[in-house]
Structure formats: C-alpha cells, structure tokens
C-alpha cells in the first residue's frame, strides 16, 4: 500500500509499534525532520487507510480500525513496511496487526463461566498483492515475542476464515471452545489461566456493621447474651455492718426498710395540738396587726 509521503522515512524500522498516543518513532541521524504535527498526521492517515482496506477485505460494513479508535482505546498496532519496494523513493506498507487486552466472560470445556483478561487479536490485514509471502507469519511472530504470549493464550475477535486457516497452518490451532460471544478461543486457553476467585454478591446493609470478624461471630453464636434487664451487671456495693431486715412481701423492694406502723387519725391530731408551735410561727402571730387573741384561739 503506497502513500504520497515517505513511509520509509516515517517508519525507520521494518515493524513499527504504535500505541494510543500515535507518537512518531525516533528518526535516524542525519535525516530531515519535518514538523511533529505533520508526522502524526501522516501516521493517522496510514492507520485510517489500513483500516478501510481491512474492512473491505473482510466485507465489514465499517472499519474497525481508525486513528480515532486508536486514540480512545489502549490498543497496540504493529505495522509492517516493505523495505524492498520503493516506488518513487517513498516506500510502502505491507499490513498491520492490532491487539489489546479485554475483560471477557468465556466458557471453558465444562461450560463454566470464567472472567479473564487475555490479549485479543482485534484486526489483522496483509495487502492482497503481498499475501502468501511469509509477511503475515513474520508480523504475527514479532507480536508474540513482543507481548510474551503463546498462540493458544490469545482470544480472536470475529476471525475470518482466512485468519482461522492461518492459525491452523502456522500454529496448529484447530479445536475451538464454543462461546456465546464473538470471540474465539482454542483448546489449551485455560492451561495457564489462574482459577477465578468466586465473588459473592454484595448483601444489603441492615443496620450498623459490627467490627468483629467471622471467628468472633461463631463465638457469639455459642455464648448468647441474655436480654435486658437480665444482662445488667450487678453492682458490687460494700454490704452494711448491720443490714436492715427485709420484708417478706413480694411487692416490696428488697432494698427498702420496714414500714412504720399505722397511726390512727385522732391520735395524730392530738399529737399535733400538744406539739408546741415553732418559734417562727410565734413571731408571725405576734406581728399580725389584725389578729386578736380571741381570733387566734378560734383559728388554733
């Protein structure tokens, strides 16, 4: 695939790795360096054209690879250039491979759901005129070494029949594990996968959470505290030297002393008459201007 600018100068290496920042690779010493904005624009043009060519080859309604998608996702793109062909001294692009990590729910051979985050093949394209020349295997092998993964550990997003034949021919990937999504995984995918931790659904909070562990909960199940007021700790008071006698009545408090005997009303009034008045009461009667001795006798 040719472009109106110098691809060989833009991509010094045979295989260039681009991330979401789309930064131009380091320039060779002694080469003319255009403005950085122009270099990034050229990279975006290459990515857009490669995405359109890949969508056309796979009969997709719209490209799944573009510069805007690369900038908004944490994907990695491997671009292979043709070092032998230099039309008009500008170089050419052979193809590309786009990968990225994704969280997936996949089924194993026992049809159990597993939450994994494998490296996924998201898009793969080699120019039609350069296929069956070993370029695809070279690009794929470079990606495996760079990402440090094995072919059976990959998940492929909507692979074409050409890609499935390619993987079967070069990496002996044939037996697939049926899935309910658009990703394809092969036998041996779970060989190096750690078993996922079983997560229980969160429970609705009921009241305050008590700060004790599960072992403390088991202990509390054995030693159940009695209800109030039986759970109140008794007060340790110093017993008196001569404790008062307790009443045998069930309605009286055990701490209350014996009641005084009942006094008849007539005897109570007689004792009040014989009781001498208080000095303060005498003073009030003496200072009362309207009170006569006769009236005081009648009121008494």
UniProtKB/Swiss-Prot annotation:
Family to which the UniProt record says this protein belongs: Belongs to the acetyltransferase ATAT1 family.
Protein modification: Autoacetylation strongly increases tubulin acetylation.
Residue positions where Asymmetric dimethylarginine is found in the record: 282
Protein keywords: Acetylation, Acyltransferase, Cell junction, Cell projection, Coated pit, Cytoplasm, Cytoskeleton, Membrane, Methylation, Phosphoprotein, Transferase
Phosphoserine: modified positions: 249, 253, 292
Record-given protein name: Alpha-tubulin N-acetyltransferase 1
Residues with site note (Crucial for catalytic activity): 58
The keyword Cytoplasm appears for this protein: yes
Sites bearing N6-acetyllysine, chain numbering: 56, 146, 210, 221
Domain N-acetyltransferase: 1-190
């Amino acid at each position: 695939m040719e472009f109106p600018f110098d691809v060989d100068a833009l991509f010094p290496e045979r295989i260039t790795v681009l991330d979401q920042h789309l930064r131009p690779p380091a320039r060779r010493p002694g080469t003319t360096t255009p403005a950085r904005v122009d270099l990034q624009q050229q990279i975006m043009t290459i990515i857009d054209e490669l995405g359109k060519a890949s969508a056309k080859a796979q009969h997709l309604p719209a490209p799944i690879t573009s510069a805007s998608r690369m900038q908004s996702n944490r994907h990695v793109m491997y671009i292979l250039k043709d070092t032998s062909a230099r039309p008009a001294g500008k170089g050419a692009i052979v193809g590309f491979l786009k990968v990225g990590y994704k969280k997936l729910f996949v089924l194993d051979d026992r049809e159990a759901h597993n939450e994994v985050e494998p490296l996924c093949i998201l898009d793969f394209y080699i120019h039609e005129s350069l296929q069956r020349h070993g370029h695809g295997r070279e690009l794929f092998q470079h990606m495996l070494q760079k990402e440090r993964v094995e072919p059976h550990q990959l998940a492929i997003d909507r692979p074409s029949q050409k890609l499935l034949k390619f993987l079967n021919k070069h990496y002996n990937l044939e037996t697939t594990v049926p899935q309910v999504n658009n990703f394809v995984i092969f036998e041996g995918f779970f060989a190096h996968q750690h078993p996922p931790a079983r997560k229980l659904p969160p429970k609705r909070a009921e009241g305050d959470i008590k700060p004790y562990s599960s072992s403390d909960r088991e202990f509390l199940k054995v030693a159940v505290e009695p209800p109030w007021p039986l759970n109140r700790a008794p007060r340790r008071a110093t017993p008196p030297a001569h404790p008062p006698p307790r009443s045998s009545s069930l309605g009286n408090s055990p701490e209350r002393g014996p009641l005084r005997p009942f006094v008849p009303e007539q005897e109570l009034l007689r004792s009040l008459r014989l009781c001498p008045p208080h000095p303060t009461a005498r003073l009030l009667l003496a200072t009362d201007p309207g009170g006569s001795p006769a009236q005081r006798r009648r009121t008494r």
